[in-house]
Amino acid sequence: MEVRHDWTVAEVQALFEKPFMDLVFEAQQVHRQYHEPNKVQVSTLLSIKTGACPEDCKYCPQSAHYRTDVERERLLEVEKVLDAAQKAKVSGATRFCMGAAWKNPKERDMPYLMDMIRGVKDIGLETCMTLGMITGGQADELAGAGLDYYNHNLDTSPEYYGQVITTRTYQDRLDTLSHVRDAGMKICSGGIIGMGESSRDRAGLLVELATLPTHPESVPINMLVKVKGTPMEDVEDVDPFDFIRIIAVARIIMPMSSVRLSAGREDMNEQMQTLCFMAGANSVFYGCKLLTTPNPGEDKDMQLFAKLGINSQEQAAKPDEVQEHELLGQVAQRVAARPGKDDLFYDATV
């Protein structure tokens, strides 16, 4: 199957309407053409700055607009981030993702963020960040520090977007993706299913991703995790078969991308997750929490992988204990030498 960038909503809707077994079979055929069928890429996601976000995303418990149980926290110290990255490495992750609840990073944060990137790279993991909107200059800085992936989801279709968020435009999101690509980084971008959107909106989201000049290297598909206190806490559950169809269609129209089974896995049984892998999902987040939402523990994932004969992708070479100690010491020295350290922490709602 050739890689296309001219998919239409009508074509994608037609895929959704295929008999379920036919759709999954086609997706598995495409998957086997471009990927090893029994390999899954494993990432770990850490919240490096939690809560008090000025955006009004109706699904998000970190928004300052809603009363949830999420406690606001300042930007994590570099040492704590690297400690979490080391643990992720030991647990089997190959990529370490760092997320901050910001509208956009401020310039005073950039030195800290770049130290995090360099430190995680030194540990031997791929790096990914999601920091909100970024400028072209910030994208260049992050790329210069060695950031491999930048995540910025489109969330939903352009038509339904206004029902989800009003503090950031759809074009803002597309502009950020353009800055990321221009800086030479890989793109991680997907959406959330189950926010009350129509099947046409789901098709529209995938078309937006599949008609980018270059398909995202990673496409996370999230199932809404309903959180008390957010406007979407009572939205109707998405049908599991509809969710699996999303995975299958994403695999068919973006054949070379990694399709990540992302948030919501805690509410999926093993059978549903297995059908998602059959439909072309070949990446997961590993660990008991995704930012502030629950996720299956490592043991559960390893048990499921063993049942299915799935192997996680090979890690890069891991530094030995002495090397790790030296690397942490070097990063600590860089941080301690920076003037105005305390000024790098701030309230994101200001």
From Swiss-Prot:
Residue sites binding [2Fe-2S] cluster per the record: 97, 128, 188, 260
Family named by the database record: Belongs to the radical SAM superfamily. Biotin synthase family.
Function as written in the Swiss-Prot or TrEMBL entry: Catalyzes the conversion of dethiobiotin (DTB) to biotin by the insertion of a sulfur atom into dethiobiotin via a radical-based mechanism.
MF terms in GO: 2 iron, 2 sulfur cluster binding; 4 iron, 4 sulfur cluster binding; biotin synthase activity; iron ion binding
Cofactor: [4Fe-4S] cluster; [2Fe-2S] cluster
Subunit structure: Homodimer.
InterPro entries, per database record: Aldolase_TIM, BATS_dom, Biotin_synth/BioAB, Biotin_synthase, Elp3/MiaA/NifB-like_rSAM, rSAM
Protein name: Biotin synthase
